[in-house]
């Protein structure tokens, strides 16, 4: 026994400390504490009791502007402190004009990120898992209100870690400055294509007008060529007639010379001077004879 007792070391009791160590306490919501100090001006804020059920709403001291209407059960309230400045946010019952909220897509994404961070911090601070059941009527009403008013919808499911799933439905409105694409083409390409199409149409119309002008000129040239051929034929015919008349005139002239020579030989030069009178008398006698023959 003595050997066994000598082999085992003796355990000395720990001395009781006169001053107990203070437990280290950490603030679960450092961002809320800073906002409360900024809101109350450094005064002692009121006590805050954590709820056993996770809520999508932020800290109650951040409710600066209360809503005038009471929302149905299950619809999260929208607070101006969580939204970006310059945006337009109305009651879920009142529809929002998409023309007055150009940056709704960015606002929806930022709201979902901010609510996700807030819900994560609350889920860490609350002990245990948080879960709440929403009846089917309230869930349908919440879905209808979120789809009608384009507000971020909050859906919760009973999970192991008790985290909340935040889902946002941003407005289907194009952000300002976005380039609208028509038929897979940018506006500049569309304008260039329209200009090129107009240029091609102008060239085509010019080609058509030039072709019609060539056809008109060709038809006129063919007509003139036909007239030229006709005139050439007529000219050849007239020349032939003139040549024949010239030949006949030459024959008459030669006969006249021969008759004149014969008269000179028969009557002499004096006979030629009396010849026209004699011819007239002879012609008159012939006419008288013809008249008498006709009467008989």
UniProtKB/Swiss-Prot annotation:
Organism from which the protein derives: Petroselinum crispum
Gene: CPRF3
Transmembrane parts of this sequence: none
Annotated protein name in UniProt: Light-inducible protein CPRF3
Subunit structure: Binds DNA as a dimer.
Record-linked SMART domains: BRLZ
An example molecular function term from Gene Ontology annotations: DNA-binding transcription factor activity
Chain residue ranges for the region called Disordered: 1-27, 98-165, 190-223
Function: Binds to the G-box-like motif (5'-ACGTGGC-3') of the chalcone synthase (CHS) gene promoter. G-box and G-box-like motifs are defined in promoters of certain plant genes which are regulated by such diverse stimuli as light-induction or hormone control.
